[in-house]
Amino acid sequence: RLMQVVGSRGYERVEPPLVEFEDSLLSGAGQDVALATFRLMDPVSQRMMGLRADMTPQVARIAATRLANAPRPLRLAYAGPVLRVRGDQLRPERQFNEVGVELFGTEQAEADIEIVSLAANAFMAIGVTDLSIDLNVPTLTTMIYDAVGMDDATAERARLALVRKDAAGVAALEGEAARIL
């Protein structure tokens, strides 16, 4: 159902390979997951291959290469299994499904708003209630303050409430700001 929601919002599904040659899989942003990547030898080419530990770098590479000439903004969605050498405290499992969306070629704050809205709608579509999303993008909150016509004093109260994760303080804001934030 998640993929149906993102598809209905114009996100095209891409399916990166589960196994790739190491020089492709771990290039660019893929370097960040090198230590988490299972490796194996391809018996035909005698080259090292890796099982993806994160699909995001693969999708970024697809956007930059095969879809380099596609019109922007480019909206891509993906879902599939990933495998990591070891889990961590937050996610001890080594194999799990990853679902994501990427938006390339648009203003940062606008893209952030679209992605957050899409995530909220997708989670509601699968029955998640009382959703709380933590944002750490100063440009996004400033854009929200401007969009709802918030004066400087109210913007400062909103900023402090958000920093403190004070739901009552956010709810006490005037107008549309409380609903959006």
Describe the predicted segments one by one.
Residues 1-181:
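Extended, charged alpha-beta segments that form solvent-exposed binding/catalytic grooves
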